[in-house]
């Protein structure tokens, strides 16, 4: 971003910004060759204030302890601190150290090809969580060298940040989202395997199954750090979440084995939210394999996303069942395929929105948000008869949405939910 552009944006921001938000910084990130997938997620997480504060606190804690570490978390913390401590409010910064560390840690990202922003998001939060857990293990080992907790032979089984894998309450199995097994089949306390990643992003789904013969209802809980939901043409986030929790009938070869009946029976099952997370990360499944093309392509369906969201697909015993969410950031994919295109980020800073396009930062009118919902007709997968290699139209479509719980932001002076934003219920 040039000096003229930076000063102009700074003037625009100063005229609309509240006093509480006067110390916020808006810095574009340099693209090191198709690293927009990384830049877009970093910008989104930077403006998820609970996440940013935890990252900055991590750096401060290390500084106080005098410890010197070189991992992906410290690289991210240094980047966040560098942005937050700049003298100018607006500018550009190069995340070179973070990108270098990322490529060194994971060969998937060690190239100049376009990567999937959602895969990077999953990798980042799981890596942070695993690092924090390992640090807790090291601290406990150091504090209990003469205790019952033995040193060495420690295995960290960190679950992926997606819904759908079972929680295990049985001793001897790895627990969901960070079960720790130590020598002698001993388990660390749950507090040792719960990190601030879980505190911020983790929710609980409950899979309810009702036998249609005896009416017995069984349930199974599953932790999640984000939700991946299917998309349909000309719909909304509310509709997609309703479909996610639709009742499914199990019959024929899919019959359910009922413990009460001791036999396979027809049943109905549905997935509902038992514990809504503090920060809800929604991933729209926009990429699918198309057989005529023999490759993955993009579903540029128009899916309207609200600025305010209330979840109603919750279980009867749900914690915070009436929780209201505010949209704080959106990662947008521009292009026709997973491996081609570009990522940008829309973020909310107090009373206004901005768009981050690598090193370019611009204000965004709320009225323009709908332009990033996708296309009303999906030109990407429609092909003229006899022509399977027709040109594909690009589109700007919301890909990852970050909704922050309003009660979670109650003490955040920079979070303002006043205004005439649309509210959609699920």
From Swiss-Prot:
A lipid is attached at residue 2 (N-myristoyl glycine). GO terms for molecular function: cysteine-type deubiquitinase activity; ionotropic glutamate receptor binding. Keywords: Cytoplasm, Hydrolase, Lipoprotein, Myristate, Protease, Thiol protease, Ubl conjugation pathway. It is an enzyme of class 3 (hydrolase). InterPro entries: Papain-like_cys_pep_sf, Peptidase_C19, Peptidase_C19_UCH, USP_CS, USP_dom. Residues 162-181 are annotated as: Disordered. The active site is at residues 36, 342. Interacts with wdr-20 and wdr-48; the catalytic activity of usp-46 is increased in the presence of both wdr-20 and wdr-48. Interacts with glr-1; the interaction results in deubiquitination of glr-1. This is Ubiquitin carboxyl-terminal hydrolase 46. The lineage of its organism: Eukaryota, Metazoa, Ecdysozoa, Nematoda, Chromadorea.
